[in-house]
Every structure is written in C-alpha cells, then in structure tokens.
C-alpha cells in the first residue's frame, strides 16, 4: 500500500527550517556513501560497504528560508534490500545512484524506482537519477543519453557526478533541496537549528522534468 510522505515538515516554532528526509538508493559500491561524505565533509576515501543505514544531517540556508536535510545512506547489498525498505517511511526525496561503468547498477536503479512507486503516490517524492564515477569515463557502460532518456521517460531529475573529483556533488543535493522548498512553499526567513549551514546562492543546474509527476 502506498504511503503518504507529504511535504517537508516545518517546525511549529517561528523561523525554524523545513525538515526533509532524503534516502540514497542503489547497488553496492556505486558510491552512495562517497557522495554523502563528499557533500557533508568534503572528504573522499575508500569506504567499506554500508551495513544497514548511515545517517547525516545538514542545514541548507537559502536566505529567505532554510531546510534541514536528513540524509539516509542505505546499504546496497541484496541481503539488506528488505531492510532498506523500512527507511522509505517518511521520505521526501530519493537519489537513485548508479555507476556509469556498470550497466547492471543502472538496471538496479530502475528497480529501486519501481519499489518507490509501490510505496508512494505519484508526486509525493522528489526523485533524482544520479550517474556516478564520471572520472572513469573510458570504462563507461551507460551513456549520458541513456540516463537522460530514462529520467525523462519517468519524469525524474537527472545528473552525472564524480564523488572522487567532487564534480557536481553539491549541485545534486542542492537541486533536490531547492525542489523540496519550492514544493513546500517559501514562508519567509528561517533560522537553522543544528548541523552545518550551507548557502545555496547559486543557480541550480539545468534539470529534467519534474520527478515523480506532480
């Protein structure tokens, strides 16, 4: 049965940021944790596969409003897939991450989308398809056009990135955050509660059509 995620939640106290939950989904070793660590700590290193789920929090300051982003990094191994579905609950956004050098991971991202579609009503969740590891372009198995066309066919946001080179990592999370705030509506200035504040004073990258149709 589909569950209602609703819009990002705003605190009842005046001036508090919206709170949104974002889940990272994808096969093992596609770079979900690397993307999260690069975004949160500007750090890149070889990491062990995630067991269960890792959790990060960051407050994004847009000047007139702010958003507290709760980032849930889920395990990609098949044996954890049923557990990962538990982390869908209450999600407002999802990154479907694949490795551009592994066609199978692209297909797996499509399966994760099917799982999301079973859990949520259309338009309830902001979804971005993310092709990681553009630094390994010579080993590419999934073309940019393939990713773009699939995203367009499903009304998803789409970007390619490299956690290793820090290419478009911030843009991915910031674009999703801006989409979440747009949906929630700008209700005036907000004050971050906790976490690291990051200014989003740049124009978002060109995006595909609205993800998970409105």
UniProtKB/Swiss-Prot annotation:
Tissue/organ expression: Expressed in kidney, liver, and intestine mainly by epithelial cells. Expressed in hippocampus (at protein level).
Subcellular location: Recycling endosome membrane; Melanosome; Cell projection, Dendrite
PROSITE patterns attached to this UniProt entry: RAB (PS51419)
UniProt motif (Switch 1) ranges: 43-54
Activity control, per UniProt: Regulated by guanine nucleotide exchange factors (GEFs) which promote the exchange of bound GDP for free GTP. Regulated by GTPase activating proteins (GAPs) which increase the GTP hydrolysis activity. Inhibited by GDP dissociation inhibitors (GDIs).
Lipid group attachment sites (S-geranylgeranyl cysteine): 211-212
Residues where Phosphoserine is found: 29
Catalyzed chemical reaction(s): GTP + H2O = GDP + phosphate + H(+)
Entry binding sites for GTP: 31-33, 50, 76, 132-133, 135, 163
Keyword Coiled coil assigned: no
Region of interest: Disordered: 183-204
Cellular-component GO terms for this entry: apical plasma membrane; basolateral plasma membrane; dendrite; dendrite cytoplasm; endocytic vesicle; glutamatergic synapse; melanosome; neuronal cell body
Keyword field: Cell projection, Endosome, GTP-binding, Hydrolase, Lipoprotein, Magnesium, Membrane, Metal-binding, Nucleotide-binding, Phosphoprotein, Prenylation, Protein transport, Transport
Domain of life (superkingdom): Eukaryota
Binding site for Mg(2+): 33, 50, 73
Family: Belongs to the small GTPase superfamily. Rab family.
PANTHER family noted in UniProt: DRAB11-RELATED
Record-given protein name: Ras-related protein Rab-17
Source organism of this protein record: Mus musculus (Mouse)
Gene (UniProt): Rab17
């Amino acid at each position: 049965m589909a569950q209602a995620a609703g819009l990002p939640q705003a605190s009842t106290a005046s001036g508090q940021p919206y709170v949104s939950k974002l889940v990272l989904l994808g096969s093992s070793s596609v770079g979900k944790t690397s993307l999260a660590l690069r975004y949160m700590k500007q750090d890149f290193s070889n990491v062990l596969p995630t067991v269960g789920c890792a959790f990060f929090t960051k407050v994004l300051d847009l000047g007139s409003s702010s958003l507290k982003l709760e980032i849930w990094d889920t395990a990609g191994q098949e044996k954890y897939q049923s557990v990962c579905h538990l982390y869908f609950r209450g999600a407002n956004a999802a990154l479907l991450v694949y490795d551009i050098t592994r066609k199978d991971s692209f297909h797996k991202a499509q399966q994760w989308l099917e799982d999301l579609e079973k859990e949520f009503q259309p338009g309830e969740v902001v979804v971005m398809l993310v092709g990681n590891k553009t630094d390994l372009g010579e080993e590419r198995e999934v073309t940019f056009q393939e990713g773009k066309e699939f995203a367009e066919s499903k009304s998803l946001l789409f970007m390619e990135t490299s956690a290793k080179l820090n290419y478009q990592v911030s843009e991915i999370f910031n674009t999703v955050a801006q989409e979440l705030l747009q949906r929630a509506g700008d209700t005036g200035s907000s004050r971050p509660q906790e976490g690291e504040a990051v200014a989003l004073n740049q124009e978002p990258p060109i995006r595909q059509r609205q993800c998970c149709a409105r």
